[in-house]
Amino acid sequence: MSPGSRGRPRQRLEDRGLMKPPSLSKRRLLPRVQFLPLLLLALAMGLAFYIVWNSWHPGVEEMSRSRDLRVPLIGSLSEAKLRLVVGQLDPQRLWGTFLRPLLIVRPPGSSGNLQVRKFLEATLQSLSAGWHVELDPFTASTPLGPLDFGNVVATLDPGAARHLTLACHYDSKFFPPGLPPFVGATDSAVPCALLLELVQALDAMLSRIKQQAAPVTLQLLFLDGEEALKEWGPKDSLYGSRHLAQIMESIPHSPGPTRIQAIELFVLLDLLGASSPIFFSHFPRTARWFQRLRSIEKRLHRLNLLQSHPQEVMYFQPGEPPGPVEDDHIPFLRRGVPVLHLIATPFPAVWHTPADTEANLHPPTVHNLSRILAVFLAEYLGL
């Protein structure tokens, strides 16, 4: 098994490139004497229109009619607003309220899995922003026989046209009885706790944009059955994401046609919590958003807002990843959804071992990631 392969069969998926606009057809130029006055007049009219338009529509960002992504607003948060956003995060709440209840054995179909699912549902329903929480229960055939699974889907404003979707899996890998317990702290209790802390910390800000009926809303997916139950393969892995992507592809959504098309950006978190993680951009289509995360990390470092974070330990790195990784983004990627995959590569040393516990997490790294992601959300959603 080579580093970064996650012990799973490699499968290269071509990232859908953006179509280049057709070139304008050439037209005969007017004679120079007639052309210059007309050019000056056109420039004057264009400038006047631009001034009037911006006075009526301040800060409006032009959106593509295709599924292209928006251009990120570099440095769109003032330092005061950035500090305000970061100040809403509570490391003790993240760790004690959200992370520790997840650190139990929770493979699909187990009592621990159901306990965590109910905890996620109750936590999301308690937020003052008024999230729309849906359960996606289903039964699937597995190498262990039929098992019950359940995804948790939370959408801030179901009526919004587009979704920024953050996702992680909440199940832990199944190990046969008699082996040491596996609680999957990095895989993926910490990602789940990060999402809960983010929406709790930004609750008031998210409530405001919901009341304003913003065109882009936040959506969270807590997916079940990511791990293989026996041996990784197309039928023994990604149970929850495969089921949910298929369901979302069939549910109508305005302006349409379905919920899967409403996902403007799918951000998947996995294998987080060990010290000095390294992240790479996995898809050219979302490289601009990866660059945004790099810029945010550098800015927070310059402002001395990251802990145990020397200049030489930058999480978000340029260059190519060690190799493709199959994860819960695959069913969505295959349906044309833009994916930003935030997975530590190489994988943590404790990956798929009983040592993937709270004791081997690095709290400063977890809190640093919460700050980077909080600023990213605030910029993307215009909080």
Swiss-Prot record:
UniProt entry keywords in alphabetical sequence: Acyltransferase, Disulfide bond, Golgi apparatus, Membrane, Metal-binding, Transferase, Transmembrane, Transmembrane helix, Zinc
Pfam families: Peptidase_M28
GO terms for biological process, alphabetical: peptidyl-pyroglutamic acid biosynthetic process, using glutaminyl-peptide cyclotransferase
Positions with a binding annotation for Zn(2+): 187, 227, 352
Organism for this UniProt entry: Mus musculus (Mouse)
Tissue: Detected in thalamus, hippocampus, brain cortex, cerebellum, kidney, lung and liver, and at low levels in heart and spleen.
One GO CC term on file: Golgi membrane
Keyword tRNA processing among record annotations: no
The protein, known as: Glutaminyl-peptide cyclotransferase-like protein
Gene Ontology molecular functions: glutaminyl-peptide cyclotransferase activity; zinc ion binding
Compartments, record wording: Golgi apparatus membrane
Enzyme class: transferase
Residue stretches spanning the membrane: 33-53
